[in-house]
Structure formats: C-alpha cells, structure tokens
Amino acid sequence: MQQRRPVRRALLSVSDKAGIVEFAQALSARGVELLSTGGTARLLADKGLPVTEVSDYTGFPEMMDGRVKTLHPKVHGGILGRRGQDDGIMEQHGIAPIDMVVVNLYPFAQTVAREGCSLEDAVENIDIGGPTMVRSAAKNHKDVAIVVKSSDYDAIIKEMDSNDGSLTLDTRFDLAIKAFEHTAAYDSMIANYFGSMVPAYHGESKEAAGRFPRTLNLNFIKKQDMRYGENSHQQAAFYIEENVQEASVATAQQVQGKALSYNNIADTDAALECVKEFSEPACVIVKHANPCGVAVSTSILDAYDRAYKTDPTSAFGGIIAFNRELDAETAQAIISRQFVEVIIAPSASEDALKITAAKQNVRVLTCGQWAERVPGLDFKRVNGGLLVQDRDLGMVTEGELRVVSKRQPTEQELRDALFCWKVAKFVKSNAIVYAKENMTIGIGAGQMSRVYSAKIAGIKAGDEGLEVKGSAMASDAFFPFRDGIDAAAAVGVSCVIQPGGSIRDDEVIAAADEHGIAMIFTDMRHFRH
C-alpha cells in the first residue's frame, strides 16, 4: 500500500533559489497554501504568488538579525505532528499541519572557501532553523515530504498530478534519505572547518596540525554499483564528490560502451591525470594504473602513434587518454590497431564516435576541458585507518632545475628530461622512465630496487627496437647508489633527471661525470604507491 498523503500546505525557505519560483507556482496552481520566510517570501510575493510570511503565520516576528525565524511550535508542531494521532493536541493549540517542507541551507562551504573569510562570517552562515526543519520533516516522513534538492521539483509535481495532489510513502521516504544525507554533509563541513583550527578560539593555521581536522568527515555520493571490485569476489561501488571542481573520471560522461568496471575507473583516472600534465597535444596509454606509453606531438594522432610504439604488448587492453578532442583519424587508428578498454578525451567528434561505434564494447568517455588543477586531498586506506595528504600537484619548471654534473644538458636533453619527469610522477615507485624526442622509449615501474627499474626500462626499449642512445632518464626519487647510473650509461642514456637528496649524491654525481652524463636535480620527489 502506497499510503499517499495529499499536499495542502507547504513551507518554502531556500538559500539556493534556482527553480523555486516555478516550483511554487506549480504548487499554488494545484491549490497548495504557501508559507515562507525572508528573502524567499519576498521573491515569491514579487512574482505575484499568494504567500504567507511565517512571522505572520506564527504571530511571532523574525528576530536577532534573522537568527530566529522558524523555531516556533506552530511550525515544528505542524511538521512533526502525527496525522491521526496528534490531531487533537494540534487543534487545541491552533497548529495546522504542514505537508511539505522545501529547504536548502545557508551556503557554508562557499562562505568559508572565500578569501579572507573570518570566523564571524563563518558562524553567521551556520544555518540553525533550516536543518531543524529538514530533520523534523524527514523524521515525520510518513506524513510530510521534505525537499532539499531543486532537481526533485519536476518529479514531485509530476507525481502529484498522477496521484490527485498526493505523494506516496516511497517517495517521501526517498526524500527523507536525501534530507538526512544533506544535513549530515552540512554538519560535516562545519565540523571539519572548526576542527581544522588550532586549539585556540579564533585560531587559524596553515600548518599540518591545523590543516587537517581532529575528526575527518567525508561525504561522497554513489554514482554507480559495479559488477565486482578489483577481483570478482569483491563487491564494489563508485562514489564521487558532490561538487567536483575539475574535469576528472568522476565528472566524465560515458558516450559509448559497456559499464565501467572498478579497474577501468582506476586506470582511466591514472591516464587522465597524467595527460593533464601536458599542454601540447598528448597521448597517455595506461595498463594496471601505470603509463606504458606517453608522447606529445603536433597532433593527437602522431602522439598516439608514438605512445603506442613504446610498448605495443602492454598497450593491448589498455586505457588511452588525450588532452585534445578525439578526432575521426585518431579513432580509426586506435580501432584498427589494437584492443582498447577505454578512451577518454575532453570531447569527441561525431565522426570519431561513428567509428568507435563499430566496436560496441569500447568505452568512450568525455570529460570536458580543464583550465587548472584544483588542490584537494588524497586518501589511502589502511587496515583500521586512513592516510590523508595533499594531492601531488607539484611540478618543477625549467628555471627551478639544478644541473649538478660537469656537463650541461643540451636543449633537446633538457626538453626530454622535463618530459620524462612529468611521466615519472605517474609511474608506480620505484619509477624509471627513458624518453627521447618527447616520447617514452622505456618505462620501469614498481620494482623494489631502483636499479632493476632502470634495467627493465632498458630491456623494454630494446625489445621494441627503440634507440636508447642519447635519451633522458627520469627517476621519481633519488638514487641511493651509483648502480642505477651505471645501468643507464650501459644502454646509452645521456641525461638524468632526479630529485637528489641521497647521502651518496656525491658518488652518484661522480658516476654521471665518469660516463659523461648530464645530471639535473629537481629537489622534488614524486613517490607513488
């Protein structure tokens, strides 16, 4: 049984007024009495809607600069009153039932994100009456509908039209879930803000102790359930942030192909984040979260051709990311050459999509353009805990590099060094990348000793018939011994870029000088685990 409840009286009080006028007009046209507060009431009245101010309804004025508006028994009694059980007491005290509450809360997150936001500003944007009404209505969802998202307005009107002005219990319950999610997220933001302050009133700190709250409250929204997780015996789902500020796999639209798997999403994220490092047309091919081929060129077609040549074997069944629109010529080259799981790009031309449609299982995602990287937090789950750190958005510029060898790098070596340094940032540690003329020619990933990553990168280049002589080598962290330099010299590397910082730096630099290798220090490490 659906337990329909008619909507005869609604209270509307919103900070985000998108769509509220149209929704109120639709409710009023269906005979719903409108109650409202402050700016919402004035907006509705200005649009010619019959609306009663809550202060007139309760006989009690708004006070304390708007801090007290709706905290009144006529409001909360009307919301919390149980139909058929509390009718007598409601009638005795002149409390009319309120059947729908439409509320969204003061913009606390936007306020504290503003430059120069003071504690006083933040405090004044902590909503009290709003969450109280939301929780009251959600608690009494058997009788009351609570609406916190403007995206639900149209569906609510449609259901009312289908049910003689009523909403079903299933709908009211779903709306109540959204309401509790909304208030939980809101309180989490406030707790995180206050918890990030140093242990003193009004204290503010940019240090780590103040950057991270005492209790970390996180809110993510489920985007999709998955067939399984990393392995078939693991259940999984994909959750995303509510307001993602940067083009990402979380914001991407799937325009073709089967549902994304857990591993597809993880690998696509790795590919997309890597390709974002480049301003020139670039292609990144990823397998098992590691780049197996990266190149930049004058077109994405040539970039793809060159990235593929790094390691065609590993590229099979891989993820391909571009930082330019996917065009028909590039799409045809991919489909004709290899099996691919996912292609992601800022956009895709209609002709490109016609070509990829021939391979219906190929997943094609478009993520939109990105202007800049947005600071945020990275999380790593450990048994019983969570490691939290800033996103690794660091990247050195040419002017920040230090040449520590006797020989200076040539202009081409310097370009190749900066190129493979960007790639090494996204390769699992210990990471070694060989590159020549803006193309990776060998990648050694995830080895327990750095020298073996160097050897593997050389072996891979040799297996594909790529010329290592005169290439640059990037290492995501310092060389603890000279053996990595010796291994690079043995295959013809002529320039090495690395963070430096080892207690044996002098020995490592001496090895570079011995082999005539130019060595560059970045003074920035890029471990990736």
Curated annotation (Swiss-Prot):
<dbReference type="InterPro" id="IPR024051">
    <property type="entry name" value="AICAR_Tfase_dup_dom_sf"/>
</dbReference>
<keyword id="KW-0378">Hydrolase</keyword>
<dbReference type="GO" id="GO:0004643">
    <property type="term" value="F:phosphoribosylaminoimidazolecarboxamide formyltransferase activity"/>
</dbReference>
<dbReference type="GO" id="GO:0003937">
    <property type="term" value="F:IMP cyclohydrolase activity"/>
</dbReference>
<dbReference type="Pfam" id="PF02142">
    <property type="entry name" value="MGS"/>
</dbReference>
<keyword id="KW-0511">Multifunctional enzyme</keyword>
<dbReference type="InterPro" id="IPR016193">
    <property type="entry name" value="Cytidine_deaminase-like"/>
</dbReference>
<protein>
    <recommendedName>
        <fullName>Bifunctional purine biosynthesis protein PurH</fullName>
        <ecNumber>2.1.2.3</ecNumber>
        <ecNumber>3.5.4.10</ecNumber>
    </recommendedName>
</protein>
<dbReference type="InterPro" id="IPR011607">
    <property type="entry name" value="MGS-like_dom"/>
</dbReference>
<comment type="similarity">
    <text>Belongs to the PurH family.</text>
</comment>
<keyword id="KW-0658">Purine biosynthesis</keyword>
<keyword id="KW-0808">Transferase</keyword>
<dbReference type="InterPro" id="IPR002695">
    <property type="entry name" value="PurH-like"/>
</dbReference>
<dbReference type="Pfam" id="PF01808">
    <property type="entry name" value="AICARFT_IMPCHas"/>
</dbReference>
<dbReference type="GO" id="GO:0006189">
    <property type="term" value="P:'de novo' IMP biosynthetic process"/>
</dbReference>
<dbReference type="GO" id="GO:0005829">
    <property type="term" value="C:cytosol"/>
</dbReference>
<feature type="domain" description="MGS-like">
    <location>
        <begin position="1"/>
        <end position="148"/>
    </location>
</feature>
<dbReference type="InterPro" id="IPR036914">
    <property type="entry name" value="MGS-like_dom_sf"/>
</dbReference>
<comment type="pathway">
    <text>Purine metabolism; IMP biosynthesis via de novo pathway; 5-formamido-1-(5-phospho-D-ribosyl)imidazole-4-carboxamide from 5-amino-1-(5-phospho-D-ribosyl)imidazole-4-carboxamide (10-formyl THF route): step 1/1.</text>
</comment>
<comment type="pathway">
    <text>Purine metabolism; IMP biosynthesis via de novo pathway; IMP from 5-formamido-1-(5-phospho-D-ribosyl)imidazole-4-carboxamide: step 1/1.</text>
</comment>
